[in-house]
A protein has these predicted regions:
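Generic recognition of stable, solvent-exposed alpha-helical segments in well-folded globular domains
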Residues: 21-25, 67, 144-147, 151
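Nuclease catalytic cores
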Residues: 1-36, 90
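A non-catalytic, helix-rich entry segment at domain boundaries
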Residues: 25-92, 96
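Residue-level signal for well-ordered alpha-helical scaffold segments within enzymatic catalytic domains
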Residues: 4-7, 28, 32, 74, ...
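Active-site oxyanion-binding pockets that recognize sulfate/phosphate
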Residues: 16, 57-62, 135-142
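Mg2+/Mn2+-dependent nuclease catalytic core
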Residues: 87, 91-170
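Short amphipathic alpha-helical segments and their helix-coil junctions
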Residues: 1-13, 46-55, 118, 126-134
Length: 170
């Protein structure tokens, strides 16, 4: 998405806002889990202790704040390992597509039975496609997330010589 482009390609780091700092905080916690450094219980404790200092900016309203806070807490309480061996967590990839340089961070790259899997952690629930003739904002957002996964698959193919078997959201 555009925010990813600004952050990783243009190296623009604007003022942290609620949604971006929430996503950054959740990714940091999930990374600790997949690297084997923290248990879900430890992550819950960190979440409760650090939420106020890590998640800056204001949510649009109390309902949104409550939804994100409780959703993140529930997510961390129910974390399960992926059915893949770990190849990389927050794996940095530098690559070129059609002459355009990209830098990205694959949330989780796994291997099972010699196949590769790219997993993109989402710290909130994604809405399914609407099937409307004219795409909704949620449809366009989902398309942007999917494009990011396909771009990452190009980086994986460049480095490992094979395309991932699956591109997944978690």
């Amino acid at each position: 998405p555009y925010r990813w482009y600004l952050k990783y390609i243009k190296k623009f780091h604007g003022k942290d806002m609620f949604f971006s700092s929430y996503g950054t905080f959740m990714h940091k916690l999930i990374e600790l889990y997949h690297k084997g450094e923290k248990t879900p219980r430890q992550l819950v404790d960190m979440y409760l202790q650090d939420f106020k200092t890590e998640v800056v900016g204001r949510a649009p309203n109390r309902k949104v704040f409550s939804s994100y806070f409780t959703g993140g807490l529930q997510y961390l309480k129910t974390l399960q390992p992926f059915p893949y061996d770990v190849v990389g967590v927050e794996k940095k990839v530098d690559f070129v597509v059609n002459g355009i340089p990209f830098v990205g961070y694959i949330d989780f790259l796994g291997r099972k039975d010699d196949d590769l899997y790219v997993v993109d952690n989402k710290s909130r629930i994604l809405k399914p496609r609407s099937s409307r003739a004219k795409p909704t904002k949620a449809d366009e957002e989902l398309d942007a997330y999917l494009r990011q996964l396909y771009i990452y698959s190009a980086a994986v193919e460049e480095e490992y010589g094979k395309t991932p078997k699956s591109l997944c959201f978690n």
